[in-house]
From Swiss-Prot:
One of its GO terms (cellular component) is cytosol. A motif ('HIGH' region) lies at residues 9-19. It comes from Salmonella typhimurium (strain LT2 / SGSC1412 / ATCC 700720). InterPro entries: aa-tRNA-synth_I_cd-bd (IPR045462), aa-tRNA-synth_I_codon-bd_sub2 (IPR020751), aa-tRNA-synth_I_CS (IPR001412), aa_tRNA-synth_I_cd-bd_sf (IPR008925), Glu-tRNA-ligase_bac/mito (IPR004527), Glu/Gln-tRNA-synth (IPR000924), Glu/Gln-tRNA-synth_Ib_cat-dom (IPR020058), GluQ/Sye (IPR049940). Monomer. The lineage of its organism: Bacteria, Pseudomonadati, Pseudomonadota, Gammaproteobacteria, Enterobacterales. Its main location: cytoplasm. This is Glutamate--tRNA ligase. A motif ('KMSKS' region) lies at residues 237-241.
Amino acid sequence: MKIKTRFAPSPTGYLHVGGARTALYSWLFARHHGGEFVLRIEDTDLERSTPEAIEAIMDGMNWLNLEWDEGPYFQTKRFDRYNAVIDEMLEAGTAYKCYCSKERLEQLREDQMAKGEKPRYDGRCRHSHEHHADDEPCVVRFANPQDGSVIFDDQIRGPIEFSNQELDDLIIRRTDGSPTYNFCVVVDDWDMEITHVIRGEDHINNTPRQINILKALNAPVPMYAHVSMINGDDGKKLSKRHGAVSVMQYRDDGYLPEALLNYLVRLGWSSGDQEIFTREEMIKLFSLGAVSKSASAFNTDKLLWLNHHYINTLAPEYVATHLQWHIEQENIDTRNGPQLAELVKLLGERCKTLKEMAQSCRYFYEDFSEFDADAAKKHLRPVARQPLEVVRDKLSAITDWSAENVHHAIQATADELEVGMGKVGMPLRVAVTGAGQSPALDVTVHAIGKTRSIERINKALGFIAERESQQ
């Protein structure tokens, strides 16, 4: 049997991390078994579905590189198919037309709740032989079995049983002729030959209803696996108050897709004590049996740690392709300065996100108009004039511009003036970067370049002279 899974989001908003984890688990299960992965857009909610949400879902899937083998399919383009199946069910007696008014149903609900009963349709039209005009408004309901139970072996949670007496006669077509969500899902899974449905635990109550419809259609019933929810670190359901929840927001915040995928796969699944997983390792090791039944807590610090790891272990050239977008967001002109792959090497240890890297690299490419006030006050003082003049002259004398020779020039300045490296290094750092923090000074000065470094030292000397004149 060929394994076939699907990810079926509703385009009523962005792709959130819970949906992304479900997509990842479905994708990994299919890839592990050499099967196929289908993308299906469940857009039957015409009022809330938007083109922008569809685009956001596709962007998120593409950014995570969760490629699909079939689709994207759109439910709104399959209404003829759904209605044809409903007509067949009406003919077969597994569905029936319901003419009950909204007022009657509301009164029925109120009466049942007053008696402490679970609100459900009472089956009036199921057993009615009244004649109705062809154009009289009605819905179509599924004739759910009235006895027995539905048992399915959840691939994560084990056997789950529902009594058919607890299940309603589900509406499968509205009065406007549009099919409903639970019915469309069933026909799609049947037509697309889905073998394993991996989805959130909020769908558990839908499963017995969908199984009953599949059986009424004499269609194969897939295996089901329901993944637990994701909570915030406070134990409450993950929401915007816990930080970003949209996949593309993590892109915007400077995370690499490898980091988010690695974090999401471990958010409810484990393989021993291993924390770092390549995509290939995920595919090889993933199994539904190792997925936890308990809710997972989202820990942003752990994700940040993983992101820092991947910034420093993936090929700098690859990281640079993702960094480019953030550089563009900061409007930095990188034509005069180090290659972005070199920048990744320079700033990787200091920066935990690509956004942070882009926001802290401008001095490598563009001149700054003023020095950081605190850094200048502390380090660009009259006592720094001589170290800056000496190191400037030694840097000017370098014929083979390299980080090693820059280091020798700084060290030689400290030796000549008989001062510690900090007495030379800190004023030099503020002079060439405009701030008090940077990567190692020799590689920083080397990356900024000889001409630009000397110009900035002269600017710092001018700043010191002006400061002296004001005292």
